[in-house]
Amino acid sequence: MPPAYISTMSKLSKNYLNKINKILNKILEEEDKKITECAKLIRDSYKKGGQLYIFGTGHSRLLGEEAFHRAGGFAAACPIRDDNLTFKKGAKKATSLERTPNIAKKALSKYKITNNDILMIVSNSGVNHAPVEAAMIAKQKKIK
């Protein structure tokens, strides 16, 4: 590679990392209290025998998969798995289904989630039907 190309890539990499660090610092400043509160809820639930369930659709479900069964990770993490909310049957189908009423209810009903557990809901937009419905179900059942 020509030296000019490497120099440009180096500048782009540094610029990218600087922007990421700014975003992470902003999150730390603005959300630290909330993150700490959530961590305490998860810890307290775990101490009482509770589990951390993670619900998401599309790419958002990957956080649950990532947390599940990791060496050295949190053993009580359980992803909510439902093939209808993955891309297994195609992106168009999954996108359509995540906007279908009762889809979250159907997915959550496969698990014995109690008000001693934590339900983490992951959503890119926060507006699709499935994650909103999951939050409403959690609120109704007094699940944190």
Roles of regions detected by a PLM:
Residues 1-8:
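N-terminal amphipathic/basic-hydrophobic helices that include classical n-h-c signal peptides
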Residues 12, 27-30, 34, 59, ...:
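Catalytic cores of large soluble enzymes that bind and process phosphate-bearing ligands
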Residues 47-144:
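Glycine-rich phosphate-binding loops that contact phosphosugars or nucleotide phosphates
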